[in-house]
């Protein structure tokens, strides 16, 4: 996937000051974001990295159906405390199926289907995300070694497949609530996420 660096700026946030960089696919116009801290000079060791797919409902509207918003905020806090790290914010709403289909899937979940079956009932993949842009974004930031903040083993393998040296995994268990317990259980049981049983 050809993407190009197009803009950067400082970004003060409630969790500390970061740099925000925008990368664009010149063919589709799709824009992805790197929110970084402490990378003004090339890092000399592994860097905290989270690959976070866009979730309008969770990130912007504080939806309780998922754990995306709390994960994003917890990562910003973690990186700010560490003084170095990057969030790759990928524009892949609804695990890559888009906002409209995501809301259609939500309607099916309201009828009792889990997050996997809801997608499949719409004739869509359970997870349609891609990660081929990550290596270009990390290369631009001079990040060579990664401590990946994730519970998803597929992300670890996807980054390794891009030639990224993932040296460690940092678990992230936040945002559990009565509305998303079934969703989190489904991610563990059907999508192989690395939650512990006592996380639920």
From Swiss-Prot:
GO terms for cellular component: cytosol. Its EC number is 3.5.4.25. It comes from Acinetobacter baumannii (strain AB0057). Catalyzes the conversion of GTP to 2,5-diamino-6-ribosylamino-4(3H)-pyrimidinone 5'-phosphate (DARP), formate and pyrophosphate. It catalyses: GTP + 4 H2O = 2,5-diamino-6-hydroxy-4-(5-phosphoribosylamino)-pyrimidine + formate + 2 phosphate + 3 H(+). The active site is at residues 127, 129. SUPFAM superfamilies: RibA-like. Binds 1 zinc ion per subunit. Its cofactor is Zn(2+). Belongs to the GTP cyclohydrolase II family. The lineage of its organism: Bacteria, Pseudomonadati, Pseudomonadota, Gammaproteobacteria, Moraxellales. Keywords: GTP-binding, Hydrolase, Metal-binding, Nucleotide-binding, Riboflavin biosynthesis, Zinc. Disulfide bonds: none annotated. This is GTP cyclohydrolase-2.
